[in-house]
């Protein structure tokens, strides 16, 4: 009986530490989950499908931007928050490009994945094409705003005059 009493006292003295530990862990975990999965809306005018995007691109002479993504892709969500939602990017993309998102999990996009050598469904991939759909520039993986603007500049220098 005497042995259990000191153990109980030790447990009671350290109990509040464990409560705070789990509270802090919960707050940090929820914050990280919100950061990874929160994606603000953006004002980019996305094309409905590849055929219509290529048709618009051919008629306007503007290059296409293909963004290969998936609902489960955390780096894609970070790009959507940090790159696609940016006002400068929105202005440039809407005025000088035809943007199209391609969900790698959609079976209807299998031909597009094959055409751009993404049969494995790697995400995120950003490809800039000419009006005929030929790849001009591409980046694999999540990229920041400055690298994205350099990608656009390399493929269509006239689109980014004020950088």
Predicted regions and their residues:
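Disulfide-bonded cysteines in secreted/extracellular proteins and peptides
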Residues: 18, 73-76
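Short active-site neighborhood of thiol/selenol oxidoreductases, capturing the structured segment around
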Residues: 60-73
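A short beta-strand-turn-helix
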Residues: 46-63
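N-terminal targeting signals for export/organelle localization
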Residues: 1-44
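Detector for the c-type heme attachment site
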Residues: 77-81
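Thioredoxin-like thiol-disulfide oxidoreductase module
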Residues: 54, 87-156
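Short, solvent-exposed mixed-charge patches
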Residues: 157-163
